[in-house]
Amino acid sequence: MDVGMMMIFASYGWDDCPDGQVWEEEIKLARIAADSGFNCLWSAEHHFNDYSFVPDNINLMTYLSAICPDIDVGTAAVILPWHDPLRVAENAAVLDLLSKGRLRFGMGRGLARREFDAFRISMDETRGRFDEAAPMIIEALKTGFMEGDGPFYKQPRIEIRPRPQHSFEGRIYAVASSEDSVDSAAKLGAHHVMFADRPWEMRAPVIEHGRELHRKYH
């Protein structure tokens, strides 16, 4: 069994709790999880809200990989529509280099309108941006090169430096709850990430459908 800890960085319901204290407490929990033999530390990406405020989970995991050297670190997830795919690939490559191959790279497309509005990105573009950026990033992490010629990202072929040092086989994840996202994750060959926000009796058929699609595509 693989056991991880999801880091949210939330202060919702904590009256007058400083943001710095929230972060200090989460880092303490991360250390406890690492020392207790957990397999992976995971972090969401959210912005501007008490519900969760960790705007750069790759940056966070680079720090945690240094202070917790015996546990994997994962992103659940980097919200691709909010980022340039080239920068995501570069930053992930740096984290994986410094952590000696301990990154589990997870991607998502986001869902909070408040966040999309702040980044001046239409929610109508989330599926297109994700489906375009995700394979570009995966290809860059696997081969060291990125290029793209889609409607959102015109990227001339360029080499990623530092070059990826470790195989990302089996270390790519995608958050998927909707039917479209489950299909997208399967096409990418990514591990399927699903949050426990409803009874597992409702989730189990979706998970099994994702497995069937993965077998179909691969």
What do the PLM-derived regions correspond to, one by one?
Residues 3-7, 41-43, 73-76, 103-107, ...:
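Hydrophobic faces of well-ordered beta-strands that scaffold small-molecule active sites
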Residues 26-29, 61-64, 88, 92, ...:
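Aromatic/hydrophobic pocket-lining residues that form π-stacking "cages" and hydrophobic walls in ligand
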Residues 1-73, 170:
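N-terminal beta1-alpha1-beta2 module of alpha/beta enzyme domains
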Residues 12-13, 50, 82-83, 181-182, ...:
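Flexible loop/turn segments at secondary-structure boundaries
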Residues 53-59, 199-212:
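Active-site-adjacent beta->alpha loops and helix N-cap segments on the catalytic face
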Residues 17-25, 52-56, 83, 87, ...:
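Alpha-helix N-cap and loop-to-helix initiation/capping positions
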Residues 8-10, 46, 78-80, 108-110, ...:
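Active-site beta-loop-alpha junctions enriched in small/polar residues
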Residues 84-190, 204-208, 217:
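Internal, glycine-rich beta/alpha segment that forms the wall or movable "lid"
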